[in-house]
Regions:
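Periplasmic/ER-lumenal interhelical loops and adjacent helix-loop junctions
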Residues: 24-30, 406, 411-499, 620-643, ...
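Membrane-interface alpha helices of multi-pass inner-membrane proteins
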Residues: 342, 361-376, 410-416
C-alpha cells in the first residue's frame, strides 16, 4: 500500500510539473527598432542594424525578459562578408546553454537552440561581423520561439529518477530480491561499475571537451535525427547537414548504434547530452562485454576483472574517446573482446573427446563481427586480417569438421544480418559514387608510424594531433599502448620461462603465446620498424600498398594490439595464480597501478587543458570541415573542397527556362517550369547527386546529374511540374527484408534450441 501511494504521489508531482513546464509564452519578435548599434561604425534604420568594413561586435538587442525553458532562436540577416556570429548574453547569472551560431554569407537565416535553466530579465543577443572592404552585414530581425523540449526532458529525467528511487526502496524493504544473490557477485558488480564510472569522469563536466572528430560525429547524430523525422528507416541519406543537400553518412558509415542518441535528440535532449549518454553507454558495453568474454575464456572472475580494467582504461581506448573523439573506433573496440572469445570458442571444440560439436559456438563470433561492421569498417578490416592469419596458422584445425562449419556459419550469419547495410555500401563503392580520397597508400602508413620508444610510454598529453614521424613527437597526441601492456607481456614471458608455472594451465599458456605473438605483430605494424615505405616502392605490390593504405594511419594497429596484449596479461596472472598466488596478486596490483594512474592523469589533463565546447544543436557545427571532415562521401563529380560546396541553395536554370514554382522539404523537391527554347535545357537542383533519387514520370523531363548535382533536363517546349525525392533502390529494401528475416530466424532457432536443451 505504501509503495502504491508513493508511486501515486510521484505521478502527481511529475504530472503537475510537466503541465507547468509545458506552458510556454508567445513568440518574442525582435524587430529592427529593438536592435541597437554597439560599435560606432554600425548604423540602424527600419531595415535593421548595418555595418560595413568592420570586424568585431557591432550590434546587440535591447534587454529581453526570458522565463526558464527551451527556445529556438531564429536570426534573419544579409551578409556578403566572412562568416558573422551570434551569441547570447545572460547578464546576471550566466547559466544559459546555447550554440555560438555562425552567420554564413550564403544564407539569410540561422537557427540555434537556447536552454534557460533559470529565467532572466536582462538577456540579449550579440552580433559579431567579419567584413572587409565593400562588404556589409545586415541584421534584419530575430524571433525567439519557445519549445516544449524543456518539458519533455524534465519529465523523462524525472521518470528515470523515480524509477531508480522506487527500485532502491523495494530492495531496502525486501519486496524484491537483489538480482545478484552472492556477496562475491555484488563485489564484482561494484568493481565493474567503478571501472565504468572512472572511465567516464570527463563526462561529468557541464560541457564537452574538444575532440578531433567530435563535430563530425555530432553531425552524424543530427543527420540521423533529421532522417528519422523525415520518415526514413533505416536512414541512409542525411537530410540536415551541408545545407540540406543530402549526404550519405548513414549509408557509407553505419550508425545503427547512434540511433538511441538520435531518439534522445528527437525527445528534446541537447546534442551534447545525447552524446554523453552514448559515450557512457558504449563504455558500459565495453565493460560488460570484456568481462563476459574473459570470464568465459579463463573461468576466473579475478582475471576477467583485471582484463576489463586494463582494456577499458587502456591508453589507446581513452585517447580514442576523449582526445580523438573517434566514435567509430572506440565503439568497435567494445566488440573486439567478443571476436576474440568467439574465435577461441570455435577452436576450443574438442571432437577427439567424442563430444558433439557445439551447435551455437559460432554465435559470439558472428555477433562480434556484426558489432565491428556496424561500428567501424577499418577496424573490421583489421579484425579480418588477424583472423585470417590465425586461421592460416592453425590450418590443420581450421579445415576439420567442427571448426570449418562453425566458421562458415558465423560468416554466413554475419553477412545475412548485415546485408541491409552492405548492399547499398557495395553499390556506391563499386560504382565509385563517392569521392573517398585515394591519397592514402603504404607510404602514408610509414609517415604515420610510431617510434618504438614512444609506443610504451607511461604518460601522454591530451592535446595535439598525430604528426608526421619526421616531425618528432613533441606536442603530439598520445600514441602509446601504455606501460601496463608492456609489463603484462613481460610477466607472461616470465611465466612461460618457469616450467612449473607454464604447466599449471596449458590453455592459458597457449592463449597467451598466441595473443602475445599477434599482439607484437600488430605493434610492429604500427611502428617505424615495419617496412611500409619499401612496400610503397615495390611496383608489383602497388595494389596491396593501396589496399593497406586505406587504413590511413599505421597507429590504427593499436586497436588489435591493445586487445591482444590485454588477454596476454590476463594469461600471465592466470598462470601464476594457480601455482604462485602471491606473485599473481603482486602482478595484478602492478598492472592496475600502471593502468589507473596514467588513465587518471590523461583524463585530468583533458579536463583542465582542453577547450570547453557547447553543442546544443547542429547550429554549433556550422562549417564544412566541422560537419563532414574531408568530405570523403561527397559526389565524385564534385571536385570542390572549399566553401563553394555550401552555396547553390536555390535551383539554377539554363537560359530559356522559366521556373514558376519551387518548394524544397528536406530531400523532396516540387517544381514547375517551362522550357521556352528550342533546345534541351536543364535546372540544377540544390541536391547532391547520389543513386536513390527518383522523379515522378513526366514525358519530356528526365532526372540527370552534372558536376555532382541533380539536374532536371527538359525537352524543347516542355511545360509542367515534377517531384524529385529520395526513395532509395528497390533492391535495398529486398536486402532489408532478408536481414530482418535472418535475424528473426536466428532468434527463433536459438530460443528453440535453448528450450530443447533445458528439457534434456
Amino acid at each position: 500500500g505504501l509503495v502504491l501511494l508513493l508511486v501515486l504521489v510521484e505521478f502527481m508531482v511529475l504530472a503537475l510539473r510537466f503541465v507547468g513546464d509545458f506552458r510556454t509564452g508567445g513568440v518574442i519578435d525582435i524587430t529592427p527598432d529593438l536592435i541597437i548599434p554597439y560599435a560606432e561604425e554600425c548604423t540602424n534604420d527600419d531595415r535593421g542594424a548595418r555595418v560595413e568594413n568592420f570586424t568585431g561586435l557591432f550590434a546587440t538587442t535591447r534587454w529581453i525578459d526570458l522565463p526558464r525553458g527551451s527556445y529556438q532562436v531564429c536570426i534573419n540577416y544579409v551578409n556578403d562578408g566572412e562568416d558573422g556570429e551570434v551569441s547570447f548574453l545572460d547578464e546576471i547569472m550566466p547559466t544559459a546553454q546555447y550554440d555560438a551560431a555562425k552567420l554564413p554569407a550564403e544564407r539569410t537565416r540561422t537557427v540555434f537552440s537556447l536552454w534557460m535553466p533559470y529565467g532572466c530579465e536582462t538577456a540579449q543577443l550579440q552580433f559579431t561581423a567579419d567584413c572587409g572592404k565593400n562588404q556589409v552585414i545586415y541584421i534584419t530581425g530575430a524571433q525567439i520561439v519557445p519549445t516544449h523540449a524543456w518539458a519533455y526532458v524534465r519529465l523523462l529525467t524525472g521518470l528515470a529518477f523515480c524509477a531508480v528511487l522506487d527500485w532502491v526502496i523495494l530492495l531496502l524493504t525486501r519486496r524484491v530480491k537483489f538480482p545478484i544473490h552472492t556477496l562475491r557477485g555484488r563485489y564484482i558488480a561494484m568493481a565493474l561499475v567503478g571501472i565504468g564510472v572512472f572511465a567516464c569522469l570527463p563526462l561529468g563536466l557541464g560541457y564537452l571537451t574538444y575532440g578531433h572528430d567530435l563535430s563530425i560525429h555530432l553531425s552524424r547524430i543530427e543527420g540521423l535525427k533529421a532522417g528519422l523525422l523525415a520518415g526514413q528507416f533505416p536512414v541512409r541519406m542525411d537530410p540536415a547537414i551541408i545545407n540540406e543537400k543530402g549526404y550519405p553518412f548513414s549509408l557509407m558509415y553505419s550508425d545503427v548504434f547512434l540511433y538511441p542518441a538520435a531518439v534522445l535528440r528527437i525527445l528534446g535532449f541537447s546534442l551534447q547530452t545525447s552524446y554523453k549518454v552514448y559515450v557512457a553507454s558504449i563504455t558500459a558495453a565495453t565493460v560488460g562485454i570484456t568481462f563476459y568474454a574473459l570470464r568465459k575464456m579463463f573461468r576466473s572472475d579475478c582475471a576477467a576483472l583485471l582484463g576489463t580494467a586494463l582494456y577499458t582504461l587502456s591508453f589507446y581506448r581513452l585517447t580514442n574517446v576523449f582526445v580523438r573523439a573517434a566514435v567509430g573506433e572506440y565503439t568497435a573496440m567494445a566488440f573486439l573482446p567478443l571476436v576474440v572469445y568467439g574465435l577461441w570458442r570455435i577452436y576450443h571444440q574438442s571432437p577427439a573427446d567424442g563430444k558433439k560439436a557445439e551447435p551455437w559456438c559460432w554465435l559470439p563470433f558472428a555477433l562480434g563481427f556484426t558489432g565491428l561492421l556496424q561500428s567501424h569498417l577499418l577496424t573490421t578490416e583489421l579484425a579480418v586480417f588477424f583472423t585470417a592469419a590465425f586461421c592460416l596458422l592453425y590450418f590443420k584445425k581450421t579445415f576439420t569438421r567442427p571448426v570449418l562449419p562453425a566458421l562458415c556459419k558465423a560468416a554466413g550469419a554475419a553477412i545475412v544480418w548485415n546485408l541491409w547495410f552492405m548492399v547499398p555500401l557495395l553499390q556506391y563503392m563499386v560504382q565509385g559514387v563517392c569521392r573517398i580520397s585515394g591519397k592514402y597508400d603504404a607510404a602514408y602508413l610509414y609517415d604515420s608510424s610510431v617510434y618504438l620508444g614512444q609506443m610504451f610510454l607511461m604518460f601522454g598529453q591530451s592535446s595535439g594531433v598525430a604528426e608526421s614521424i619526421q616531425s618528432g613527437i613533441a606536442g603530439e597526441m598520445p600514441q602509446t599502448l601504455g606501460l601496463a601492456l608492456a609489463a603484462g607481456a613481460f610477466f607472461f614471458l616470465l611465466a612461460v620461462l618457469d616450467p612449473a608455472v607454464r604447466k599449471s594451465s596449458r590453455d592459458a599458456a597457449r592463449i597467451g603465446s598466441l595473443t602475445l605473438g599477434f599482439g607484437l605483430l600488430a605493434a610492429w605494424c604500427a611502428s617505424d620498424l615495419c617496412p611500409w615505405y619499401a612496400l610503397f616502392r615495390c611496383e608489383p605490390l602497388q595494389a596491396l600498398s593501396k589496399t593497406l593504405g586505406k587504413l590511413q594511419f599505421a597507429w590504427r594497429f593499436f586497436t588489435p594490439a591493445t586487445m591482444l596484449l590485454v588477454v596476454c596479461a590476463c594469461c600471465a596472472v592466470v598462470l601464476y595464480r594457480k601455482f604462485r598466488p602471491e606473485a599473481a596478486k603482486a602482478m595484478a596490483a602492478a598492472l592496475l597501478a600502471l593502468t589507473i594512474i596514467p588513465a587518471g592523469y590523461l583524463m585530468y589533463d583533458k579536463c583542465t587543458t582542453s577547450e570547453a565546447v557547447t553543442y546544443m544543436s547542429l547550429a554549433a557545427v556550422d562549417g564544412l570541415p566541422g560537419q563532414v571532415g574531408g568530405g570523403e562521401y561527397l559526389p565524385t563529380e564534385d571536385t570542390t573542397t572549399d566553401d563553394s560546396v555550401w552555396g547553390r541553395l536555390t535551383p539554377e536554370a539554363d537560359d530559356g527556362v522559366e521556373l514558376t514554382e519551387f518548394t524544397k522539404n528536406g530531400l523532396t523537391i516540387q517544381l514547375a517550369a517551362q522550357n521556352t527554347g528550342d533546345t534541351e535545357a536543364s535546372i540544377r537542383l540544390p541536391l547532391f547527386y547520389y543513386p536513390g533519387y527518383h522523379m515522378t514520370a513526366a514525358d519530356g523531363a528526365a532526372l540527370t546529374h552534372k558536376n555532382g548535382y541533380l539536374t532536371v533536363t527538359l525537352a524543347p517546349g516542355w511545360q509542367g511540374s515534377v517531384q524529385v525525392r529520395w526513395t532509395g533502390m528497390w533492391f535495398w529494401r529486398a536486402a532489408d527484408c532478408i536481414s530482418l528475416l535472418g535475424i528473426a530466424a536466428t532468434v527463433v532457432l536459438y530460443r528453440k534450441s535453448q528450450k530443447n536443451a533445458a528439457h534434456v
